[in-house]
Amino acid sequence: LVGDSLTQRGYDSKKGWVSKLASSYVRRADVINRGYSGYNTRWVLDLMKRKPKLFVKKPTLVVVFLGANDAAVNHKREYAVPLEEYVKNMREILNLYKNVPRIVITPPPIIEKDRVQHAMETTAFDTPDRLYQHTEKYAVAAEKVAREMGVGVADAFDTFEKLGGGDLSAYFSDGLHFSEKGEEVVYALIVETIKHTYPWIASEKLSLDAPLH
């Protein structure tokens, strides 16, 4: 799993999407979390080139979940990556695993009012550091890259949009990071995407690493 804080935090509790995924694959495959909080595609790509030993050379599956920081604005502009560069970086990251099953998770929607509240509570600013429509551009671009490269897509942006009923706050802890309810949505989405795109990698299709006793 290659990503930012949305992936890193997936191990924060037993109900995190990464924790649940690892549990579903126990004794069948190791789920390796390479989520780097605060990282964008530029910094992740640089890390993959400078420290390749951090990343498995021939994994069974690669999941790339990046874009939330690339789409940063206002007082978090230092994290921002222009859309054209984001597309280029995503292609390059995916091309590092050309002969491996790959899935792209799109960045999820942003709850701007909750990001404003978060900024007011944690910084001297009263503006959001992410914007809904701006992040949507990165989600659309991520999906397009995946489709063009023939890899799987887990469209988190669209999935949350269909669930929210106009208010998505319950799925996020601060308008950006997932609540337990949001973690469950991402877990269900990635499991369904694996089953649909690469069914032979679904946990129930993999053999146990040793006999049962």
State where each predicted segment sits.
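Catalytic nucleophile-elbow at a beta strand-turn-alpha helix junction centered on a G-D-S/GDSL motif
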Residues: 1-12, 39, 71
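Alpha-helical cap/lid subdomain in secreted, periplasmic
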Residues: 15, 19-30, 43-213
